[in-house]
Amino acid sequence: NIQFDNDKTSKVLGHLQVFGTPTVAPYWLMPFDTISTNSWIYPGLTNIYRVHTSGASTTHTDLTRENVVLTGTIDPTASTAVVGVGTAFSTELIVGDSILVSGETRVVASITDNTNLAVTVAFSDVANDTSPERVPGNYSATAAGGWNGGVLGGIAILNNGVDAPQFMGTANDAKMAALTNWDRTKTCAVMRPFKRFLVALDTTESATRYPFRVRWSHPAEGGTVPVSWNDADATKDTGYVDLSQSSGFVIDCLPLGDINVVYKEDSIWSMAFEGG
């Protein structure tokens, strides 16, 4: 092996393990700085970790998403029908989510409105829960799909094509969470930052795959995630295009100066922001 240093080429004399043994087998690697540490994020198939060193000490931290407290209260009865008080089921949950109510976990089968849903298995007639939770659980990444992402204005973005894209800020105790303002009924094979935008490629929307699709968010302010992906909102700089002029699917994109280079299986496209 060789290395490049000060415009010279030299032989690599060897290598040395720096960060110790990973907690999980890494399927991707991304440098990321928190407020006080320089670290590397490495996701496995089911969990995400970061590693950093301080002197002779190496620390591996689990960043896997945690339970999310839901709005309102739920007083379950011995029924699959669930009625909430002050809840926001329509915006905080989707079919297939797991919810934890008074110590019992159930899967959402259908959502009628903000205060009514059904679960696949009836709850017991247990106590009223003033802080019910959505239980996202571990990730479902595949070895074939792996992970991708990047850093948008100081925010870590990770995506595996199966779960909702994840984000994390720079606080030392931050954990991953589902990307705010992204419709969790959608997935994308790849998500990358470009300037102040996030770009999603090869999306699946309402269970239909769009392998030629390139979808972009509204531009984000520094240290925040995009406030919208709604292409129907004329007040936002969101949108999408289907690069279906050839049969190749979109597979990735990476910034090159002021353009975003979009790679298909059989062609390469350039993407640029031309707003005012």
Predicted segments with their positions:
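Small/polar beta-strand repeat architecture
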Residues: 63-93, 98-146
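Recognizes the extracellular SEMA beta-propeller fold with strongest preference
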Residues: 1-68, 133-276
